[in-house]
Amino acid sequence: MIPQGTVSHRWRVSYRHAESMGAHWQQPGQSRTRLERTVCQHDAMPPEFVTSPGGPRVATARTKLLVSVGAAIVGGTAAAVAGAGRAAPLIGWDILALVFGGWVWSTVWRLDAESTTSDAMREDPSRDLADVVLLGAAMASLIAVGVVLIAAGHASGDLKYLQAAFGLASVFVSWTLVHTVFTLKYARLYYTGQPGGIDFNETDAPDYRDFAYLSFTIGMTFQVSDTNIQTKQIRRTALRHAWLSFPLGVVIIATTINLVAGLAG
């Protein structure tokens, strides 16, 4: 634990990066002492939780992921016992994605720019691992969607439409989770290391909703719109993001066509 009134070296470095942006991120009346006091609270917290400025303790990415996986196992097992068959793994995945995504957005949606800065700068080694696990699982879930759609093709009556709609909803859940993960990643890249890197064409510092705008725009159009990416690291991240978004978009379109054709037939 770091004594009150002192700041670890890594946070001094991060502070200098943030300070270099000056009015670009600081709000009127904010002092260096206030930021240092907040940073000390971060350093003193146990690894599973940190304290957001002016708010309650915030769970780490690892905690969110573990809780979500636990909920998925329980839900998927219950679905299998209830007779869901091949759809049970996909039900488990949907529960994981909904729990993790809902937890994230309930935490970050109302954060202002200052709180977004603090949250994004928070050191959490489990974040990168959580990103890899979630993105990999989201892409793998497309296989489960294919299995459900094949089963829907051999089903009859209302069950056919129910399975097709379930497949479409599952792809949408995976699609949303992918862009949620990249929303958090863009915020981390912007506020840590080399500060900045994304020009939102305004003087106010960006919050998570601004990064969500960038992330979901890439997810829907495979390109940036009225924001300018200014660093190689963020540009390469955006390239990977667009590359992952394409198969998800294709599957959503294909699933929608399959559902509409089934309803028309």
Task: Give, region by region, the residue ranges found by the protein language model.
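The first (N-terminal) embedded transmembrane alpha-helix
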Residues: 59-79
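Short, hydrophobic transmembrane alpha-helix segments
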Residues: 76-90
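Loop-to-helix transition at the N-terminal end of transmembrane alpha-helices
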Residues: 86-102, 106
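Membrane-water interface of transmembrane alpha-helices
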Residues: 101-113, 180-192
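Juxtamembrane helix-capping/reentrant segments at transmembrane boundaries
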Residues: 116-136
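Membrane-proximal soluble regions of multi-pass membrane proteins
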Residues: 190-192, 196-228
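Pore domain of cation channels
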Residues: 210, 214-217, 227-264
